[in-house]
A protein has these predicted regions:
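Accessory alpha/beta interaction modules
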Residues: 1-170, 179
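Short amphipathic C-terminal alpha-helix that caps PH/PH-like domains
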Residues: 44, 113-114, 192-199
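Short, charged alpha-helical interaction segments and adjacent helix-coil junctions
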Residues: 1-17, 25, 82-90, 94-99, ...
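Short hydrophobic alpha-helical module
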Residues: 44, 50, 142, 176, ...
Length: 283
């Protein structure tokens, strides 16, 4: 608390407000908590596009959040899970990463994550039997600016686009593109799209009624409340990405206001900005 105020009093005053989900410290506490494994499982299946028997069903947290621990930064992913499969099917290993800034070092670090996670699967003196590795990255910049898609799978392929090794996959989700091109994705009813919209609604503290009947999102709505986070833990959390989210929200509201004042159709403004009609009218 740089201003010398009482952070406990701050948490008490704003206990029913929402934290910024994509903050490193906040997402770790929410998704890496044993009690929220249902949330994490649903999000992973949505991000990887897994359905039916391919779904992750009973994952285990490798580095669970422990109540009372402080947030920290390291060279490994904050959220890491494993999921056993029947028979001889290799075990799944899944990590979740969030990146707000488009820096060259991010790609280097992401490749380093993949290399380290893969290396850790091999035991000394044994023939390597690699697990099915999935690294999921939620990005707030375009990894593939020319692509019409916001979800991308990256694997080892040859020049004819044939997959050489299918147990090492990086899934990149361009969050910012999804909302910047909201009109393009307006009819996307995939589970991943639902997740992105639900998270965005909570980050903006907008009307959540659209998601209130979904049991998973109901839990999510409860877990992002500030009162779920201790003042001691919040003091260790870097909030710079929260500031960036606020800048993005302010930019979106400005676009909505200009479109409204120019006489644009309300349904179009809603699609483009993701804001509710009520919010747009009150700007």
């Amino acid at each position: 608390n740089n201003n010398g105020g009482d952070i406990d009093a701050f948490v008490k005053e704003y206990e029913h407000r929402n934290v910024y989900f994509y903050n490193d410290g906040c997402i770790k506490k929410i998704l890496a908590s044993e009690k929220n494994i249902m949330l994490t499982t649903d999000l992973v299946n949505a991000a990887l596009g897994l359905i039916g028997s391919d779904r992750i069903t009973n994952p285990k947290l490798v580095n669970p959040f422990i109540p009372g621990e402080l947030g920290y930064r390291g060279v490994e992913p904050d959220i890491l899970l494993t999921n056993d499969r029947d028979g001889d099917t290799p075990r799944d290993r899944i990590s979740i990463e969030v990146q707000h800034e488009d820096k060259r070092v991010f790609r280097d670090r992401l490749v380093l994550y993949v290399a380290r996670l893969t290396s850790n699967m091999a035991r000394k003196g044994e023939n390597p039997r690699l697990e099915n590795l999935n690294v999921v990255g939620f990005q707030f910049f375009d990894a593939f600016p020319e692509s019409a898609n916001y979800r991308h799978t990256v694997q080892l392929r040859n020049q004819e686009q044939q997959v050489y090794f299918d147990r090492q996959t990086v899934t990149l989700i361009e969050v910012e593109k999804f909302f910047r091109k909201a009109e393009r994705f307006a009819d996307d009813s995939s589970r991943l799209a639902q997740w992105l919209r639900a998270i965005d609604t909570l980050n903006r503290e907008a009307d959540f009624s659209e998601f209130a009947n979904d049991p998973v999102f109901k839990v999510l709505q409860n877990e992002v409340k500030l009162c779920r986070f201790s003042s001691r833990y919040l003091m260790t959390v870097d909030m710079s990405d929260f500031d960036k989210a606020m800048e993005r929200y302010e930019a979106i509201t400005e676009i909505a206001k200009k479109m409204r004042d120019m006489g644009a159709d309300m349904s179009l403004i809603v699609k483009v900005t993701g804001l509710s009609e009520k919010t747009i009218r009150e700007l």
